[in-house]
């Protein structure tokens, strides 16, 4: 099982959809070699070097955390059922209320729409908040996502810059 990496007072919690099989087998988030999460958060400015999946706990040193909408591992996120995403959305709200990070970044538009019963959303900062926590939707860094790495970095950097502007 892939455990959450959470603590009070984080700048951001990145929320994936669910663990892939590589993550389920290793116990580390975003563990598949084709997943660009670790590269993207480094290039966007969240970490001072590119961490490896097995160093995930070090995210806390950078005031970042990770969680997921659904615990059940799958080969592809499309295998996750709607009821799992809706339940995951409710559970995620509780986690965010408990830990109160400055921002929540949900990684994937469809996951956000289904988990939070929203439709037709755009990338970036959302008008909704969970308490004082800003909610962002960023592209999923999965290797199955065709978006170019440069575009991922640009989207994630926008969040990093917004946090810096708030003194975080």
Swiss-Prot record:
UniProt entry tagged with the keyword DNA repair: yes
Q: List, alphabetically, the GO terms of the cellular component aspect.
A: cytoplasm
The main enzyme category here is hydrolase
Record localization: Cytoplasm
Q: Which gene encodes it?
A: mug
Which keywords does UniProt give here?
Answer: Cytoplasm, DNA damage, DNA excision, DNA repair, DNA-binding, Hydrolase
Q: What is this protein called?
A: G/U mismatch-specific DNA glycosylase
Organism the protein comes from: Salmonella gallinarum (strain 287/91 / NCTC 13346)
InterPro entries for the chain? MUG/TDG, MUG_bact, Uracil-DNA_glycosylase-like, Uracil-DNA_glycosylase-like_sf
Which cysteines pair up through disulfides? They are none
Q: List the GO biological process terms.
A: base-excision repair, AP site formation
């Amino acid at each position: 099982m892939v455990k959450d990496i959470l603590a009070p007072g984080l700048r951001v919690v990145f929320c994936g959809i669910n663990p892939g099989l590589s993550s389920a087998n290793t116990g580390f988030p975003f563990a598949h070699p084709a997943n660009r999460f670790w590269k993207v958060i480094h290039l966007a400015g969240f970490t001072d070097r590119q961490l490896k999946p097995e160093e995930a706990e070090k995210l806390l040193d950078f005031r970042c955390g990770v969680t997921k909408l659904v615990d059940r591992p799958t080969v592809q996120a499309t295998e996750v059922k709607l009821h799992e995403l809706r339940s995951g959305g409710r559970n995620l709200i509780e986690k965010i209320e408990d830990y109160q990070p400055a921002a929540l970044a949900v990684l994937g538009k469809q996951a956000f729409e289904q988990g939070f019963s929203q439709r037709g959303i755009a990338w970036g900062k959302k008008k909704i908040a969970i308490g004082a926590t800003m909610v962002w939707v960023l592209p999923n860094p999965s290797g199955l996502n065709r978006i170019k790495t440069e575009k991922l970095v640009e989207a994630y950097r926008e969040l990093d810059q917004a946090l810096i502007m708030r003194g975080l």
